[in-house]
Amino acid sequence: MNYYTAPMEGLTDRIWRQAHQRWFGAPGAPARYYAPFISPPENRVLIKKKMAELDPAANPGAPAIPQLLAKDGALAAWMIGELRKMGYTEVNLNFGCPSGTVTAKGKGAGMLRDLSKLEVFLDEVFSQAEGPISVKTRLGVTSPEEFEAILDLYDRYPICELTIHPRVMRQLYRGEADRAAFAKYLPHCKMPVCYNGDITTPAQLKALEAEFPNLSGIMVGRGIIADPALLRQAVGGAPASKEELRGYLDELYHGYTEAFGMASCAVSRMKAHWHYLIQRFEGSEAFEKQLRKAREGWEYEVVVNQLFTLPLL
């Protein structure tokens, strides 16, 4: 079974990928890091600063896989070609992002609203681009039943791997992932399938693996931010120690400070990580408000020092 990390905007950037690989990476865990989506520029002029996220030199260790967010198939095919020039083999297409700012533009899971347009997009991509192309998708916009027609469309193309997040667009991340719908449609998938959604513990991951042994992979998202050692434990490694977590978080903080040029900007990014990670510390409720209110680097550092006096759960 392959284990992957999900693309999450504002969380799984190159700084995180480097720190995670250094502190918690294990052979095959993860096998791939999927990078947060990029949108191809309409003028077809790449911005060096934005592309730095995908500089192969900045992504050592486990392979990083770029993800595209686009609704113009010809433009997406051009961008895939540019990524191939950078040395990337697989490129992932995003039909799963449920964010309102994304779907309002007809991108991400918004592509699932009109299957005729999605078909045109896929025709253009697969006729013009070369090499492996994978897809990350939701089940539909409002109902899981929509996936029957969506899958019928996907099955017509040489998708190298289909990652299914079994929620619909309107759910965002509310409610539970629909395992029953996933199980219903899995036998009808003609391509390798990866599961994504609501995997937060090694036990849950192993139970899913036992339930669906023919999956090509399992992708973890919020669970790997809440427990950076999740995949390491899945392959028999140790849980995260307090010392490892401290080193990992300090590396993230200093990396963001250097990248953004200001500690206050790094604090904002670190809060996104702590939103999931804070639950690992017993009694952390007493410090949640202080962490939310922290703006400057010194304020953040004071709260983090206090959090690390608490035992891990």
Predicted regions and their residues:
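Flavin-dependent oxidoreductase catalytic cores
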Residues: 1-313
